[in-house]
Amino acid sequence: MSGKKEKKHFIVGVIMVAIIVAATATMIYCYINRFDPQEYVQAFLDVSYKQKTESYIKQTGISEKEAKQVFEDNLAYTMEKFPEHVMTDEMTEEYRELFADLAKKTSYTVGEATREENGTYQVVLTVKPITLLKDTYAEFQEKAQEYATKVSNDVMNGQAMPEETQMQTEIYQIYYEVLSQAAEKGLKYGKPNKIVLHVEKDKEGKYEIRKADLQNLDH
């Protein structure tokens, strides 16, 4: 009789241990695979603007090559706004390097996340905008006018009128020189703006930042 009780206690003990181990394993799994919207937003911004890939790879499970491509795609999107027919290959590379450097100096702070009833997270982002374009606009206008005056005087003195594409190329070169020289002296930042980012699941159940919010980041 005593042996049966001991056996019963042993079996119960084994079952309890199994339950505890299973529960602990579940807790560990949930902890390891927990989703932190604040960390996700930080990782996404860092890979997008500063080309820091490590955290984003951990968050999404993508390869390093894919993570690096996020930064490259952002640069490509920026360069699409420039007309290819007036940009030389050398000039395109100069602008690309300039914008890559500016992106890495973007200033942002990721705030705490709050969860909505539908499971969407709201993350407040504080951004200090770089004011380089605004700060250099007057100087660019002045130098562009100087170039226009020079072309006008040259034509008045009998020289051929440059083709429109050639003049546009020259203007973009002037603009690059103004921007790069000002950037070398040090960037200035405007007043901080707060932007609310919504992190929600896509059709596949993976979290992502709402596309409309991403568009607001670039304006």
Where are the predicted features?
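Gram-positive cell-envelope targeting signals
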Residues: M1-Y56, V123
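Core segments of small alpha/beta cavity-forming domains
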Residues: Y29-T109
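Hydrophobic/aromatic beta-strand elements that line small-molecule binding cavities or substrate pockets
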Residues: V110-E112, K194-K201
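A short hydrophobic beta-strand element
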Residues: E117-V127
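Intrinsic-disorder/low-complexity, polar/charged segments enriched in Ser/Thr/Lys/Arg/Asp/Glu/Gln
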Residues: T120-Q122, G190-V196
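Beta-strand elements of well-folded, non-transmembrane domains
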Residues: V127-L133, K201-K203
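Mixed-charge, low-complexity intrinsically disordered segments
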Residues: L133-G190
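C-terminal/domain-terminus segments
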Residues: H198-H219
